[in-house]
A protein has these predicted regions:
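Interfacial amphipathic helix/helix-coil modules
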Residues: 128-170, 179
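Soluble oligomerization/assembly scaffold segments of membrane-associated complexes
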Residues: 2-142, 148
Length: 179
C-alpha cells in the first residue's frame, strides 16, 4: 500500500540519504500524527491527478503507466504497486466468474437427463477449468512489463533553463511596459 504521508504530506526528498522530508504542518513523523488526517477520497484524487499518468498508444494499443514523484524510488514503487493491484483485481474477478460458471454448469449437468446436453455442458466445464488454470498460471494478468519500472537518474521536471528563459522574457516585457 501507499504510505499516506508520502502522498499527502510530502515536502521534499533528499537524494543523498534517500529519505523523504514531510511537511510538519500536515504530518508529524515523531508522533505519527496528522494535523487533519486526509480521507481516502482525497488521497485517491491527489494520486490520480498529480502523480499517475496513463497513456494509450493508438497504433499498438499499448498502455503506458507512469508515476511522477520527486522521489524516483517512490515513483518506481508506486508504479509496481498500481500494476500489481490491477492485475490482482482482474485476476480475482475473472477467477470468481469462472468458478461461478463451473458451479452453474455442474448444476445443469446434474439436472439434465439428455446425454448429448451433458456432453456439451461437460465440454463447457472443461473450458472453464482451463481458464481457471491459466488465470493462476500468469504472473502478469492484465498488464505485463515491456519496460519494467526503473529508478530514473535524471530529473524530468521542472526545466530550470526554461524557467529562466520565461522569467527573463517576462522581465523584459514588464520593463518595456513600465518605462
Amino acid at each position: 500500500n501507499i504510505f499516506l504521508p508520502d502522498l499527502m504530506a510530502f515536502e521534499s526528498w533528499s537524494s543523498d540519504t534517500n529519505t523523504v522530508i514531510y511537511d510538519k504542518r500536515i504530518y508529524e513523523t515523531s508522533s505519527d500524527s496528522w494535523d487533519e488526517e486526509p480521507s481516502a477520497q482525497e488521497a485517491f484524487k491527489k494520486f490520480t491527478s498529480k502523480h499517475l499518468r496513463l497513456a494509450k498508444d493508438k497504433n499498438s494499443a499499448f498502455i503506458t503507466i507512469s508515476v511522477k514523484h520527486q522521489s524516483p524510488f517512490l515513483a518506481k514503487q508506486w508504479t509496481e504497486l498500481v500494476i500489481n493491484k490491477v492485475n490482482e483485481f482482474y485476476r480475482e474477478k475473472d477467477k470468481e466468474r469462472s468458478e461461478k460458471a463451473v458451479s452453474y454448469l455442474n448444476q445443469q449437468i446434474a439436472m439434465t437427463s439428455s446425454s448429448e446436453i451433458k456432453q456439451v455442458l461437460a465440454e463447457l466445464v472443461q473450458d472453464e477449468t482451463k481458464k481457471l488454470t491459466l488465470i493462476d498460471a500468469n504472473q502478469f494478468y492484465v498488464f505485463e512489463y515491456i519496460d519494467p519500472p526503473a529508478v530514473m537518474e535524471k530529473k524530468s521536471e521542472p526545466s530550470r533553463a526554461l524557467i529562466c528563459i520565461i522569467i527573463a522574457f517576462l522581465g523584459g516585457i514588464s520593463s518595456v511596459l513600465l518605462v
